[in-house]
């Protein structure tokens, strides 16, 4: 019988459909083999690593890990992170995806169908749309202590259908990638998103095109060309854009300009200030609360 629970004991996790919500401090997971699961945070950040990628999960993105994937995860005590992670019992999302695709007549004839194995491309997704709304409602109910078993079960049904729709969206996006053969497009999609997630997750490090190309398992020139065709900007343009967006958020909360420049990967304060002004139209210090025009 399917069980739907909130914050179950860790050993039960592989056998139930569950929502984990909490405020871990100096929390580390090493080489855990997961069921199909979704990784999100309400506040702060969590770092995930799998054999194929590195991911920084923040409130504006979420990560889906497929059944059987091994991952490690860490949360720093000082980050004030609140995690929100649904785990799905084996077969649950498969059945939902099959039901969404099959007609009523077929389902009447085959009530026990479980569907084909469900798998999504391992990548960061923007925390928008139905999935973000469902997660927000689940978190609000848990915090308010009104997340009964029946209510949680309904939300997991909604979430499973939303994941099936996300897989359909991903397949449509794959069709837009620059390659003739379908298999090539799918593989290029996986590799380019792996590198893209690496760039936006490791932005504080001194990254290069060659390093990102190695993550994608492509030659630097092939990677650079394919990345620009797929995402409309070069790898370094995307990295710079992301660094400046993170910097804007850090400055708005009151962090020092020099500390922010270093935190987002700039080794020159002058270069950071010039690029920031060019992108946002104001000097970095003008975004800090109570500080105006001091750069």
Question: Which residues are covered by each model-predicted region?
Answer:
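N-terminal regulatory/effector-sensing and dimerization cores
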Residues: 2-112, 143-150
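Residue-level signal for well-ordered alpha-helical positions
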Residues: 76-77, 99-100, 166, 250, ...
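Basic/polar phosphate-binding segments, predominantly the helix-turn-helix DNA-binding elements
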Residues: 168-169, 175-189, 194-242, 261-290
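An amphipathic alpha-helical interaction segment
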Residues: 112-197
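Flexible coil/turn residues that form the inter-helical turn or adjacent wing/linker of helix-turn-helix
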Residues: 145, 205, 253-255, 265
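Short helix-to-turn junction characteristic of helix-turn-helix DNA-binding domains
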Residues: 199-202, 247-254
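Hydrophobic recognition helices of helix-based DNA-binding modules
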Residues: 96, 159-167, 227, 251
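Hydrophobic positions on the alpha-helical face of helix-turn-helix-like DNA-binding modules
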Residues: 247, 260-261
């Amino acid at each position: 019988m399917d069980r739907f629970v909130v914050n179950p004991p860790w050993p039960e996790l592989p056998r139930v459909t569950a929502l984990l919500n909490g405020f871990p401090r100096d929390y580390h997971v090493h080489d855990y083999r997961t069921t199909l699961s979704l990784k999100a945070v309400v506040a702060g950040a969590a770092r995930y690593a799998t054999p194929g990628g590195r991911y920084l999960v923040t409130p504006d993105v979420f990560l889906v890990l497929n059944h059987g994937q091994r991952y490690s995860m860490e949360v720093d005590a000082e980050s004030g992170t609140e995690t929100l992670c649904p785990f799905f019992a084996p077969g649950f999302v498969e059945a939902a995806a099959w039901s969404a695709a099959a007609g009523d007549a077929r389902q009447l004839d085959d009530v026990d169908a479980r569907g084909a194995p469900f798998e999504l491309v391992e990548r960061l997704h923007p925390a928008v749309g139905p999935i973000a709304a469902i997660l927000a409602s689940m978190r609000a109910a848990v915090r308010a202590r009104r997340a009964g078993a029946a209510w949680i079960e309904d939300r997991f049904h909604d979430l499973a259908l939303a994941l099936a729709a996300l897989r359909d969206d991903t397949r449509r996006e794959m069709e837009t990638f620059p390659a003739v053969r379908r298999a090539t497009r799918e593989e290029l999609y996986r590799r380019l998103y792996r590198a893209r997630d690496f760039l936006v997750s490791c932005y504080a490090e001194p990254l290069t095109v060659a390093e990102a190309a190695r993550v994608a398992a492509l030659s630097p020139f092939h990677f650079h060309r394919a990345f620009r065709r797929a995402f409309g900007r070069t790898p370094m343009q995307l990295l710079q854009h992301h660094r400046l967006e993170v910097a804007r958020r850090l400055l708005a909360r009151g962090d020092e300009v020099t500390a922010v420049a270093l935190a987002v990967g700039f080794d020159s304060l002058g270069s950071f200030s010039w690029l920031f002004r060019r992108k946002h139209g104001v000097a970095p210090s003008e975004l800090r609360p109570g500080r105006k025009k001091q750069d």
